[in-house]
């Protein structure tokens, strides 16, 4: 189990040193045949779990993700933070506790989720259009869209996504 972004390698484990390794999850001694090393700590395979879905990370893959004190499986990391963990508008990191807006798989800070034309913030319940990577409020959607020459990729009422499990 390797934490992406972590360059540390686990220290060698031998039969003589294994008896005193403690699990970072439960604090118990690790006497199992297999143990995991993630986030500079050793874990029982049953103790290294996703903070959201509680899946045992050793059983579902070879990597885990950490952010804001949470240990996450790949699916929950992408669901909560998008592929990059950064706002699609400003590029800045989004804290795990912050509410976000989403459009077509992109994640935005609330303050960055604005109309590309008038720069007014789009709020829950507003109708918007996502066209070629840009957000438009109902008033400022391109004339071609109104005339039916373009298809709106997103024109549903907007609901915020909360970064909690």
From Swiss-Prot:
Q: Which SMART domains match?
A: LIM
PANTHER family attached to this UniProt entry = LD11652P, LIM DOMAIN TRANSCRIPTION FACTOR LMO4
Q: Residue limits of the LIM zinc-binding domain?
A: 21-83, 85-147
> In its UniProt entry, what is this protein called?
LIM domain transcription factor LMO4.2
- Give the record's GO biological process terms: cell differentiation; gastrulation; mesoderm development; negative regulation of neuron differentiation; nervous system development; positive regulation of transcription by RNA polymerase II
Q: Name one Pfam family in it.
A: LIM
- Which keywords does this Swiss-Prot/TrEMBL entry list? Developmental protein, Differentiation, Gastrulation, LIM domain, Metal-binding, Neurogenesis, Repeat, Transcription, Transcription regulation, Zinc
Give the protein's function: Acts as a positive cofactor of GATA transcription factors to establish the identity of the ventral mesoderm during gastrulation. Down-regulation in the dorsal mesoderm is necessary for the proper formation of this territory since, when present, lmo4 may bind ldb1 and restrict the availability of this cofactor for Spemman organizer transcription factors. At neurula stages, suppresses primary neuron differentiation and modulates gene expression at the Isthmic Organizer of the midbrain-hindbrain boundary.
The GO molecular function terms of this record are: metal ion binding; transcription coregulator activity
Highest taxon of source: Eukaryota
């Amino acid at each position: 189990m390797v934490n992406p972004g972590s360059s540390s390698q686990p220290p060698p484990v031998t039969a003589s040193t294994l008896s005193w390794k403690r699990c970072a999850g439960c604090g118990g001694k690790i006497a199992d045949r297999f143990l995991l090393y993630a986030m500079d700590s050793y874990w029982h395979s049953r103790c290294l779990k996703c903070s959201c879905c509680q899946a045992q990370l050793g059983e579902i893959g070879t990597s885990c993700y950490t952010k804001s004190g949470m240990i996450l499986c790949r699916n929950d990391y992408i669901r909560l933070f998008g592929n990059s963990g950064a706002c699609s508008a400003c590029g800045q990191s989004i804290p795990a506790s912050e509410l976000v807006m989403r459009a077509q798989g992109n994640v935005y800070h609330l303050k960055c989720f604005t109309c590309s034309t008038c720069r007014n913030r789009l709020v829950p319940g507003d109708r918007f259009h996502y066209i070629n990577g840009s957000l438009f409020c109902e008033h400022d959607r391109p004339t071609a869209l109104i005339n039916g020459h373009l298809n709106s990729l997103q024109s549903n009422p907007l609901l915020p996504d909360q970064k909690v499990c």
